[in-house]
Amino acid sequence: MTDLSKEELLQRIQQLENENEQLKAVALQSLHTLRYNQSCSHSLQQSNSVNEEPLSLEEFKRYGRQMIVPKFGSLNAQKKLRSSKILVVGAGGLGSPALQYLCAAGIGEIGIIDDDTVDVSNLHRQIIHKSSLVGILKCESAKQSMKDLNPFVKVETYPERLTVFNAFEIIDKYDLVLDCTDHPAVRYLINDVCVLLGKTIVSGSGLRAEGQLTILNYDQVGPCYRCFYPQAPEPSSITSCSDGGVIGPAIGLVGVAMAMETIKLLTGTYTRENFTPFLASYSAYPLQQMKTFKMRPKQSSCKVCGDRPEITKEMVENGSIDYVSFCGHIDEKNPPLQKKYRITVQEYSSLLNSQSREHTLIDVRPKEQFEITNLPGSINLDWPLVFSKCDNDKIDLLLPQDITKADQLYVICRFGNDSQLATAKLIEAGYLNAKDIIGGLNKWSEDIDAAFPKY
């Protein structure tokens, strides 16, 4: 064998290294090809298992723009949507945009449960409804809009309230539930029934210009509503859209986000391995921002999904759990005032017409509402922001200087609730001639002055 020089040896080593790199590249390409073929075969098997029936040409054209998005999941994901059944509880500010986008996306069957009717005051935010359909059931109004939007989607309506008597029967038909309600008692009912049936919940809420959403009981490994809130909020802390107001696009954005999370759940974006409990929070003012917070996991002590659950299907169905009592409620039939401290709008109207007695009318609505409309001569003392937080011995500082504790005071608000609390506070402070006007400005508009704006 001829001895090689050092230079020749180096050349030979370089040649062998190049050949080795080429062999590695060929092997790697073969591995990629094998994995790709296996993936295609697996996807085809999944596709066939999801839905054997192919999409029509119109469906390809209708859903094509979403199917080509890489993270969506292509044709198989669309077939998953088409084979899915979802229930939307509430066709209001959250449910309206969620229903529209989920219908447009091609969900196979959508159930809507809502016993309320469309009102003019709904239309600025509940955009699935039309002016021409004011007065009809919201679920039927939504169904009409959805059938016009996408005839491929089956829509089932339930013009009733969700109760312990019908919840299991209705929810059991569906793969997933969207909680678009605004009442704590219904939220707890939806949560308990879904946990006991093994259903995932997409839950949203919104008020004024803020909202939030989360996923509950994900695949029976994620936390439920009771994990987050084992105790119900105080009834006095709950503000409705009619009392607190709501900006349409703000709550609509939350509803759209709920639709997006629903699509991700149905198409398999989330798995038991990658799912992390979260709360997404949106605020429109002063600058729009969406923040996502990591939430605590499923709680072993939870009464419905924990290690030793106390709540059972039988308990819910037979009424052993009183959701209204658990959440508490304000008893409007038993006002906090004696009858002698209250007058009707008719009595106050007669007093104005007679002009027989001087008095001061105190309007305790928030400043923004007072500026919308008010009765002539009334003064504004914001109950939620100012009046309710004032010590009794300092109330005289809020009132005009010429008012004495012997003067006649009448207190009014929008619906007659805050005015009762404000009147009681005035009486406690020594203003014994203070009286509440029953039913507030809403009642004034209905019974005395039809031209007075209701909002």
From Swiss-Prot:
The keyword tRNA processing applies. Binds 1 zinc ion per subunit. It is found in: Cytoplasm, Cytosol. Signal peptide: none annotated. Coiled coil: none annotated. InterPro entries: MOCS3/Uba4, Rhodanese-like_dom, Rhodanese-like_dom_sf, ThiF/MoeB/HesA, ThiF_NAD_FAD-bd, Ubiquitin-activating_enz. SMART domains: RHOD (SM00450). GO terms for biological process: protein urmylation; tRNA wobble position uridine thiolation. Pathway: tRNA modification; 5-methoxycarbonylmethyl-2-thiouridine-tRNA biosynthesis. Keywords: ATP-binding, Cytoplasm, Metal-binding, Multifunctional enzyme, Nucleotide-binding, Nucleotidyltransferase, Transferase, tRNA processing, Ubl conjugation pathway, Zinc. Its cofactor is Zn(2+). Pfam families: Rhodanese, ThiF. Disulfide bonds: none annotated. Its EC number is 2.7.7.-, 2.8.1.-. Gene3D superfamilies: NAD(P)-binding Rossmann-like Domain (3.40.50.720), Rhodanese-like domain (3.40.250.10). Zn(2+) binds at residues 224, 227, 302, 305. It comes from the Eukaryota. One of its GO terms (cellular component) is cytosol. The active site is at residues 241, 413. GO terms for molecular function: adenylyltransferase activity; ATP binding; metal ion binding; thiosulfate-cyanide sulfurtransferase activity; URM1 activating enzyme activity. ATP binds at residues 93, 114, 121-125, 138, 182-183. Plays a central role in 2-thiolation of mcm(5)S(2)U at tRNA wobble positions of cytosolic tRNA(Lys), tRNA(Glu) and tRNA(Gln). Acts by mediating the C-terminal thiocarboxylation of sulfur carrier URM1. Its N-terminus first activates URM1 as acyl-adenylate (-COAMP), then the persulfide sulfur on the catalytic cysteine is transferred to URM1 to form thiocarboxylation (-COSH) of its C-terminus. The reaction probably involves hydrogen sulfide that is generated from the persulfide intermediate and that acts as a nucleophile towards URM1. Subsequently, a transient disulfide bond is formed. In the N-terminal section; belongs to the HesA/MoeB/ThiF family. UBA4 subfamily. This is Adenylyltransferase and sulfurtransferase UBA4.
